[in-house]
Regions:
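Serine-esterase "nucleophile elbow" of acetyl-processing enzymes
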Residues: 4, 8-69, 84-93, 97, ...
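Stable alpha-helical elements in mature extracytoplasmic
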Residues: 44, 48, 81, 85, ...
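Oxyanion-hole/transition-state-stabilizing segment in secreted/luminal serine hydrolases
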Residues: 34, 46, 78-118, 148, ...
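Substrate-gating cap/lid alpha-helix
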Residues: 150-186
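Short helix-capping segments at alpha-helix termini
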Residues: 54-59, 131-135, 179
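Active-site segments of SGNH/GDSL-like serine hydrolases
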Residues: 100-104, 127-165, 237-238
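Solvent-exposed loop/turn segments at secondary-structure junctions
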Residues: 37-41, 68-74, 96, 103-108, ...
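Conserved catalytic region of serine esterases and O-acyltransferases that act on ester linkages
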Residues: 26, 43, 200-320
Length: 320
């Protein structure tokens, strides 16, 4: 309960950094989450996606997670012949990109900061030169790294790393201002929560647990100006039913994410894309991939059919 109490304090006091102005997400938007381990593990948590659906009932948002642990803004290794990100974003007809970078890059320290800024600028320029949805450049939301939590020995305490992380977060903020993008600062609210002794919020100092993802999801929603759509925070009457409805949405989101992960990152890419694609993969896998596409689309329909509930951002207590 201490985490939830601190979360309420955070949402009451934290000054939003992003100024999205007009609503960021529109009817039927197709959203892509890209980036590092933080982005990839969002698919196992589902809280931010659930909040997006709750804040946009009837919008039929279609969200795909393309996060890949270890990805950097300029370094994204893939298996042999793996489909490039541009093709994936085009296949999804992406309207909005939520990009989570900066944590991996921060380990290059001050020496890597200028290069990161240049690479991020180039990445933004490249994305905006594309029309993945067939008509307009994608709207881009930059999401900063969280702070480094001190979990005690044998893990690093993160004191020096946080000084460096702050510089990388500032570089991302400058890039967002330069390109007129929405910027979400997760470093400040997570560091403030850690300084207040809430937690643990991570499993190893830098990768969130369920409580950390709850804090991140609520902070992202707050900075995107979505919380006004999410109702009251009471735990009686309709609010209980609303939380149950939101839990059902989250379960449907997690089921969809699992199906899409099997489509986007099949277990044996050597047969799907690689050196054993011929003669075996070319015979078996195209039909399997088509079927998975159909199942993922059906999973979207399930999410859209559920009442989102008028909920608080405190979605779940349990860890995973």
């Amino acid at each position: 309960m201490m985490i939830l109490a601190g979360l309420a304090f955070l949402l009451a006091t934290f000054q939003t950094v992003a100024d999205p102005g007009d609503p960021v997400f529109g009817q039927g938007d197709r959203i892509a989450i890209v980036g590092n381990t933080f982005a990839e593990r969002m698919q196992l948590d589902g809280q931010f996606e659930s909040l997006l659906h709750a804040a946009h009932p009837g919008h039929r948002l279609s969200i795909r997670n393309f996060g890949w642990s270890g990805d950097e803004v300029s370094l994204q290794p893939r298996p042999l012949n793996f489909i490039g990100m541009k093709e994936w974003l085009s296949n999804h007809e992406t309207d909005v990109i939520i990009a989570c970078f900066g944590m991996n890059e921060s380990y290059s320290g001050d020496d890597g900061l200028d290069g990161f800024s240049r690479d991020l600028d180039a990445w933004i320029t490249t994305q905006r030169a594309n029309t993945y949805n067939g008509s307009t450049p994608p709207r881009i939301i930059l999401v900063s790294p969280i702070a480094h939590e001190d979990l005690g020995e044998p893990l690093p305490d993160g004191v020096e790393h946080n000084f460096i992380l702050q510089r990388y977060v500032d570089a991302m903020r400058r890039a967002a201002v330069s390109h007129d993008l929405v910027f979400i600062d997760l470093f400040t609210p997570t560091r403030e929560a850690m300084d207040r002794g809430e937690g643990p919020l991570t499993i190893n100092g830098i990768h969130p647990n369920a409580s950390g993802y709850r804090l991140a999801a609520c902070s992202m929603a707050e900075q995107l100006d979505l919380l006004g759509r999410l109702g009251n925070d009471s735990l009686d009457g309709d609010a209980v039913q609303d939380q149950e409805s939101q839990a059902a949405v989250r379960r449907a989101v997690l089921a969809k994410n699992q199906l899409f992960f099997q489509r986007w990152r099949p277990v044996n890419t050597e047969y799907v894309y690689g050196r054993r694609h011929e003669p075996y993969g070319s015979q078996n896998f195209p039909d399997e991939m088509k079927k998975l596409d159909e199942l993922v689309s059906e999973a979207d329909q399930v999410i859209w059919s559920l009442p989102p509930g008028d909920v608080t951002c405190e979605i779940q207590e349990e860890d995973y």
